[in-house]
Amino acid sequence: MTQRTVWQDFQNGQQYMATWPMRKELAAIFPEQRYIKATKFATRVMPAVAVMSVLSQMAFNNYGALPQAMTVALFALTMPLQGLWWLGKRSRTTLPPSLAIWYREIYEKITSEGHAMQPLKKQPRYLELAEVLNRAFKQLDKTSLERWF
């Protein structure tokens, strides 16, 4: 097994976030949509929270509380990283048997419709599931998807 760095987990999280289909049908089944929304929100908002926590203490000349404000700022800045890290770890996790069967069924449906796909994985991960789901929602019609959603 190869060693992965935290940086690679962040990159995998970004890739997984870009790949996962943001569909309401999947929201009840998988937590990814909530994590992706929270991570995107934290990426936009938390830098401002970090700056405001430090600047507010400086504006009120409360330099005694600056260490606590810097701690809050540091925590706020790490929140998007926590989401990316979780998504990166999740993307590399092997699917449980029930989801692996689901992955294979959807994969076979896409290929039976005549669409080209990468080779079927023996041990699919959540990233491959995201890719297959993304392709299914883009290339299959609603009647084909009714069986699963």
Curated annotation (Swiss-Prot):
Membrane topology, record value: Multi-pass membrane protein
Keywords for this protein: Cell inner membrane, Cell membrane, Membrane, Transmembrane, Transmembrane helix
InterPro entries associated with the record: UPF0208
Spans traversing the lipid bilayer: 41-60, 65-87
Pfam families with a match to the protein in the record: DUF412
Organism domain of life: Bacteria
Subcellular location: Cell inner membrane
Cellular component terms (Gene Ontology): plasma membrane
NCBIfam families: PRK01816.1
Family stated for the protein in its record: Belongs to the UPF0208 family.
HAMAP family: UPF0208
Protein name in the entry: UPF0208 membrane protein PBPRA2797
Protein species of origin: Photobacterium profundum (strain SS9)
Highest classification ranks of the organism: Bacteria, Pseudomonadati, Pseudomonadota, Gammaproteobacteria, Vibrionales
